[in-house]
A protein has these predicted regions:
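Conserved residues at the C-terminal ends of beta-strands
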Residues: 21, 145, 183, 213
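Metal-dependent phosphodiesterase/nuclease catalytic metal-binding core
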Residues: 49-182, 191-207
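Localized chelating/binding microdomains
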Residues: 9, 185, 193
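Short, charged/polar "capping" segments at the starts of alpha-helices
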Residues: 24-29, 151, 189-192
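Short histidine/acidic/glycine/proline-rich micro-motifs that form metal-
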Residues: 18, 25, 126-127, 185-189
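A glycine-rich helix N-cap at a beta->alpha junction
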Residues: 37-51
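Canonical P-loop GTPase G-domain recognition
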Residues: 207, 212-214
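Active-site HxH/HxHxD metal-binding segment of metal-dependent hydrolases
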Residues: 1-41
Length: 214
């Protein structure tokens, strides 16, 4: 985050919008200001926007973000990004182009708005909010933490409120994501252990969906 802000500031680019949990906004602002003073003896320009779980954020003409509630020792949220499109209403699917044009000319609304999930990202969490948004399971790409992977670390996952590999295995049949990107893996594991342990828990078809960000 400091690199993102400082590079825009030094290049004279207008500050980007940074969405952060409302509970942590003040602390994040303090940290950024102190790093800024250390870096250039001045204050960077940035824009922090507080969000709450279940907020809907319109951040481009055709993109919206839903704030997903997560469970962690401190406030943590995830984001589901959806593309907004207009599609022809089902009742007009059998009409010709000229018929649809005539309806539009007469003032009939022939389209409706739909939202198509594109990517979901989960921050630090001990739960996966599958029931908090109906499109989460449909997201083509799901990026999730998976801090602990070995059986002996199940209690540690509970104590620190992070996800264990067992929970990822459990939700795989419920999600349609083509890419399930696992990240935030504990540094206690070496690369070989991570790859062998994780891929051994999934079927061949699910292995093709799993991507590791080590």
């Amino acid at each position: 985050l400091p690199i993102y802000i400082s590079q825009r500031w030094m290049a004279g680019i207008s500050p980007g919008k940074i969405f952060v949990p409302a509970d942590g906004l003040h602390q994040i602002s303090q940290i950024l200001d102190q790093i800024s003073k250390l870096d250039c003896n001045s204050l960077w320009t940035y824009e922090l926007i507080p969000v709450q779980p279940n907020d809907r954020i319109e951040f481009r003409n055709n993109l919206v973000a839903y704030v997903l509630p997560l469970t962690h020792r401190v406030t943590s949220v995830g984001y589901l990004i959806c593309e907004v499109r207009k599609k022809l209403k089902p009742e007009f699917h059998t009409l010709s182009g000229s018929e649809i044009a005539a309806l539009k000319k007469s003032g009939v609304t022939v389209t409706h708005q739909v939202e198509l999930p594109k990517v979901a990202y989960l921050g630090d969490t001990s739960t996966i909010p599958m029931n908090d948004h109906p499109l989460l399971a449909e997201s083509p790409t799901l990026i999730s933490e998976c801090t602990f992977i070995l059986p002996e670390d199940r209690k540690k996952a509970v104590d620190t409120m992070h996800l264990h590999l067992d929970q990822i295995v459990e939700i795989m049949p419920k999600i349609k994501s083509r890419n399930v990107v696992l990240t935030h893996l504990s540094r206690r594991y070496d690369t070989a252990t991570i790859q062998q342990t994780i891929f051994s828990r999934f079927s061949r078809s699910d292995q093709e969906r799993i991507k590791l960000l080590i």
